[in-house]
Amino acid sequence: QRPTPCRENGTVTAGNASGVNDGACALLLAGADAVKAHGLKPRARVVAMATAGVEPRIMGIGPVPATRKVLKLAGLTLDDMDVIELNEAFAAQALAVLRELGLADNAAHVNPNGGAIALGHPLGMSGARLVTTALHELERRHRIGKRARYALCTMCIGVGQGIATVIERV
């Protein structure tokens, strides 16, 4: 039996939507002065961040203009991204973002260890989870000799908005 859609004649079901669950993530952001003062060894740096919005009725597509904006700010392209962490509110939303950005539905560098549908979507920590997951994947790829410099982390943040961050492994 197929899962019941969330609304009449809809396609989003509990089977293709991320679970809203509990979770925790720690992510330390520090400026150069704090890094020096406390003897910290950075693992990555934030290259650029951007937010953007679309009409609220087009829920979930906000990461597209945010991604275009952050790449322009960073002076980079999607081809420069070794890892892309795209938060999946639900499958159709993630596919729409991928297709609008010109990425294949099964691009191996997008959510290589699973996205929110597989891992869950704990509200309030999903952004930190995306950055942490991307950094760990960059480090893993570096250890095995794969290209591992930049990661793009992006998600919709409600009411048509999107946020995107580019990090660089250091």
Functional labels for PLM-detected ranges:
Residues 40-51, 79-88, 108-113, 146-156:
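Beta-strand segments within the central parallel beta-sheet cores of soluble alpha/beta enzyme folds
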Residues 9-26, 47-73, 85-88, 118-133:
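Active-site pocket-shaping loop/turn-to-helix segments
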Residues 3-4, 50, 71-74, 94, ...:
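Structural signal for hydrophobic packing residues in well-ordered secondary-structure cores
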Residues 47, 68, 82-85, 94-98, ...:
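Generic hydrophobic alpha-helical scaffold/packing signal
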Residues 1-32, 37, 100-103, 107-109, ...:
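N-terminal extracellular/periplasmic Venus flytrap/periplasmic-binding protein-like
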Residues 13-30, 127-170:
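Conserved beta-strand-centric core segments of catalytic alpha/beta enzyme folds
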Residues 35-42, 68-83, 101-105, 142:
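Phosphate/pyrophosphate-binding loops at sites that engage ATP/ADP/AMP, CoA/4′-phosphopantetheine
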Residues 56-63, 88-108, 121-126, 163-170:
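Short glycine/threonine-rich loop-to-helix capping motif typified by GTGT followed
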